[in-house]
């Protein structure tokens, strides 16, 4: 189900944060968010439950927690500014929400890069019903 919603959003041309996050992921990992991270493990993509399957999935769990901590923000649609210098993502000026959303996305993209060596193709398009372990708290 999670994959359906992500593909639907991509097809209608979502502007803003989701596309910015995809660009950050591409810059850091040389992989597109879809298909590599949009439905990986139990937490990458829409929603999440259970225990993260590996370090990459934990990046998504932490990213979800980061978004949860934002109050009165729209992390999936707010547009923020950032730049890319010598392999480093630098979040730019903006509202407090925009800065925090950018930092959440930057941290996740860096986490994905750091965990590329342990990325497992078997967790791509992982089915939600397989995420049966008790969920962790943020």
Swiss-Prot record:
Tissue specificity field: Expressed by the venom gland.
Native source organism of the sequence: Crotalus viridis viridis (Prairie rattlesnake)
Further facts: Negative results: does not show neurotoxic activities.
InterPro entries referenced in this protein's UniProt entry, alphabetically: PLipase_A2, PLipase_A2_Asp_AS, PLipase_A2_dom, PLipase_A2_dom_sf, PLipase_A2_His_AS
Cofactor note: Binds 1 Ca(2+) ion.
Record EC number: 3.1.1.4
Taxonomic lineage from the root: Eukaryota, Metazoa, Chordata, Craniata, Vertebrata
Protein name: Basic phospholipase A2 Cvv-N6
Subunit structure: Monomer. Binds to calmodulin.
């Amino acid at each position: 189900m999670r994959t359906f919603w992500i593909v639907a959003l991509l097809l209608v041309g979502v502007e803003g944060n989701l596309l910015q996050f995809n660009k950050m992921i591409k810059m850091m990992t040389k992989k597109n968010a879809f298909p590599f991270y949009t439905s990986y493990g139990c937490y990458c993509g829409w929603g999440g439950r259970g225990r993260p399957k590996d370090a990459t999935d934990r990046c998504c769990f932490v990213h979800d927690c980061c978004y949860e901590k934002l109050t009165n923000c729209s992390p999936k649609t707010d547009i923020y500014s950032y730049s890319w210098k010598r392999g480093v993502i630098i979040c730019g000026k903006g509202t407090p929400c925009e800065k925090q959303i950018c930092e959440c996305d930057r941290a996740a993209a860096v986490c994905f890069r750091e965990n590329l060596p342990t990325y497992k193709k078997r967790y791509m398009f992982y089915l939600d019903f397989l995420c049966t372990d008790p969920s962790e708290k943020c």
